[in-house]
Structures are given as C-alpha cells and as structure tokens.
C-alpha cells in the first residue's frame, strides 16, 4: 500500500482541503491518505473552532482514510517544531510521501531553499540574533539574512505562511533522512490569512469568522457541511480567557507575588523572554486588583480578554503569533520540559478511520515501532498532555454552552 501523508488542522474542513486531498492522491498515486491533525488547540496559538472528533468526522466523510493526532506539544509550537513533529509521526506510520500546500507550488525551489537553510543553520541563528538584538522583528531579520545567502526572490518565499511550513517540512526530511518523498500543491483561492470570503476556496480564517452565515455551505464539502451544521458549539480564541486567567493567577500565587520568582517560572515556557514575562507579571497583578491592564481592554466591553492581552504584551521583536502560542502553552501547562516527552516516548494516537484506514492499521500494527493507540486507557501516562488539553477544551465548551462534553476516556476513534 502506498501512503501519502497530509499535515492538517481542518479548522474547519473546507473546499480547499478537499482539493488538497484529491490532488495529493492524484500526484502521488497513493492508495491511502493519512492526515496528521492538530487536536483541540492549533498552531496559530488558539483553540480549534470545533473539537478534534468533529473535525476528524468531517475529514473522514470527505475522503480522508485515516486521521491521527499531532501531539499537542508540537501542535502549539513554532513552524519548525510543528513540522518536525508531524514528520516524526508520518515516519512512524510509514508514509511513503507527503503532499503539502504552498504559495510557490515549486518543489525544486522550496527544496533548494530548505537545503540552504540546513547547511547554514549556525550562521542563520547568529545573524538573526544580531538583528533582533537591535529591535528588528524576527521575520524581518530572517528575511535579511536569507536574502544575503540566496537572493531577493528566493528570500521572498518566506513571507508566505504555507511556503514557510513547506520549507520546514523539507528541512525535517533533510535533517532526519526520512524516506518520505515530498510533493507540493499550489494553494488555490484565498490566502491563508484572508478574513473575507472571495472565492470558492475560502480560507479557514474567513470561514471561522462566518460560521453562522447562511451561505457558508457552498464553501464546504456536502458531508462535512452536514456535520458542521449539526454541531454549533463553536469555540473562539477569547473563550480561553478564564482558563488563562486562572493559570496566570496560579503561577502568581505559587510565586508568593514575587516578581523575580514569577518571571523565572513563566520563562520556563517556550517563547517567553524576560520582557514578556515582566509584562505578564504586571498583567497578573492588575488582575488581582481587578484592574484591566492599560491597552489590554477588549473592544466589546473593556474587560480583559485573551486576544487583547496578546496584543498588549506583544513586542516588535516577538510577533503576535508567538505570543499567542506562549499564552496557550501557559494555559495548558506545557513548559519546555514537555517538548522532550514525545522524543523519549513516541506514539501514534488514532482519532478515526474509514474501512481502508482500518485495513492499513491492521497491515502495519505488527511492524510499527511505536505504540499504535486506539484505546487510551492503556496509555494514559503517555498521553497525559493530550488528555489534559482535551479536558481544558471540553471544560471551555461546557462553560460556554452548558453541555457536557465527553472526554478522551469515553470517546474512541471515529469510524466511517
């Protein structure tokens, strides 16, 4: 069986994802499609708009054969770690190829850039650090350094979201010598960050902002649309405000209100530097006095919110996306030591499958080198971070909609 891997979030599944799936099967000649999908929290540093089981069902009913979960530590990490984690999973599940979207659509150019970045990793780190130390943003610094190593047009590829991830997938393949052949599919329709619907291939960003619109069904495959319409418990970034608030106050109390101890504690989380930690301390102290941090008022009612706090504490050197991921990791309690966990205890967590996907699982079960998990009760220690993230997500849903969400211990893989 030939297997193509797809690294996804399906947040939610839409026409562009169906195009990607069909094109991937056509280009690679694969028999089986395996989606490595983020769980209940996604790479942009937000909760997913729908829970992972609903999104798995949307994918399987649209033609994906097997969905496995990208461990949460990778799912809410930088593009480099996100891609590295996804490729680890695809390697363990014995994928022959990976097909990913890109604005470039040119695998040769993307591969050449990935090789250059791998060959000059130490130089890149040192030169980028020099620029950021002088107040230049990370993205702008990287652009300048890569342009010196290549040329303006090549460096410009790293200004587009999908190209950035594409290069990171290729870097992971190069560094680890994975026997996974890469293919790229040129992105169709609206751009990744478009907030308005402009074509039949609307961005997931635009769709999340228009989920209650009457005409949204035309941008989502029929079966996926029926699943979407039957589940309206949508979760948005600001819905995690209370969970973040509780976590920050917990760190503050554990620090006995000592600023230096608080800063030391939050700097254990990826992407939190001393300046960001200091701003978080002030915000946490303001919460104690029920004072909304100046500049952190939400647009709706002036109250503190996740989104407004992210905007408040971001800096020129540290972009908003990085701040959001840092705060989500704090909310979930995923400090730096948690990043080592999957490297030491790898696994494949199955979220769902159709008949072909089930046949493939049976085919590889005896030869796969890591636990292939369909029943989590036997692996609860190994899956602790993923289970904890799901529990927090389910508590948010229950608090917002007054409904009981069944956790990971109750819900088995989705079967289609």
Regions found by a protein language model. Name each.
Residues 6-7, 36-37, 68-70, 183-185:
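Short beta-strands and strand-loop turn motifs
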């Amino acid at each position: 069986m030939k297997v193509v891997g797809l690294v996804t979030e399906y947040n939610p599944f839409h026409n562009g994802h169906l195009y990607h799936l069909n094109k991937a099967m056509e280009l690679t000649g694969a028999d089986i499609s395996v989606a490595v999908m983020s769980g209940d929290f996604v790479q942009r540093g937000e909760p997913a708009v729908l829970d992972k089981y609903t999104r798995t069902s949307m994918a399987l009913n649209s033609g994906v054969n097997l969905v496995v979960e990208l461990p949460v530590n990778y799912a809410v990490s930088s593009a480099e770690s996100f891609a590295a984690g996804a490729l680890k999973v695809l390697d363990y599940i014995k994928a022959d190829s990976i097909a990913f979207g890109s604005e470039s659509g040119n695998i040769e150019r993307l591969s050449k850039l990935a090789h250059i970045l791998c060959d000059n990793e130490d130089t890149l780190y040192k030169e980028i650090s020099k620029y950021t130390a002088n107040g230049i943003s990370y993205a702008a610094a990287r652009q300048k350094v890569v342009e010196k190593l290549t040329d303006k047009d090549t460096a410009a590829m790293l200004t587009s979201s999908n190209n950035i991830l594409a290069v990171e997938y290729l870097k992971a393949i190069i560094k680890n010598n994975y026997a996974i052949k890469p293919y790229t599919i040129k992105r169709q329709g609206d751009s990744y960050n478009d907030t308005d619907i402009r074509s039949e291939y609307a961005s997931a960003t635009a769709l999340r902002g228009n989920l209650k619109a009457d005409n949204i069904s035309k941008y989502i495959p029929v079966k996926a649309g029926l699943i979407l319409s039957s589940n309206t418990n949508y979760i948005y970034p600001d819905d995690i405000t209370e969970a973040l608030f509780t976590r920050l106050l917990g760190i503050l109390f554990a620090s006995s209100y000592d600023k230096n101890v608080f800063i030391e504690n939050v700097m254990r989380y990826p992407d939190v530097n001393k300046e960001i930690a200091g701003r978080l301390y002030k915000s946490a102290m303001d919460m104690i006095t029920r004072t909304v941090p100046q500049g952190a008022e939400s647009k709706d009612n002036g109250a503190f919110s996740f989104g407004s706090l992210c905007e408040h504490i971001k800096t020129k050197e540290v972009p908003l996306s990085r701040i959001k991921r840092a705060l989500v990791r704090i909310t979930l309690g995923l400090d730096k030591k948690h990043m080592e966990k999957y490297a030491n205890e790898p696994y494949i967590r199955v979220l769902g499958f159709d008949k072909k996907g089930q046949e493939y699982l049976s085919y590889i079960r005896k030869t796969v080198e890591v636990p292939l998990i369909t029943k989590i009760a036997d692996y609860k220690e190994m899956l602790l971070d993923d289970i904890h993230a799901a529990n927090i997500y389910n508590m948010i849903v229950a608090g917002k909609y007054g409904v009981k969400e069944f956790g990971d211990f109750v819900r088995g893989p989705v079967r289609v």
